[in-house]
Swiss-Prot record:
Lineage, opening ranks: Eukaryota, Viridiplantae, Streptophyta, Embryophyta, Tracheophyta
Keywords linked to the UniProt accession: Cell wall, Secreted
Name of the molecule in the record: 23 kDa cell wall protein
GO cellular component terms given for this protein: extracellular region
Superkingdom of origin: Eukaryota
Subcellular location: Secreted, Cell wall
Length: 20
């Protein structure tokens, strides 16, 4: 129920795939 949590996940997904 925390929007920030979802936003953090979405923003961290690309970095998890390609840490560049």
């Amino acid at each position: 129920s925390n929007p920030n949590f979802i936003l953090t996940l979405v923003n961290n997904v690309p970095y998890t795939i390609w840490p560049a």
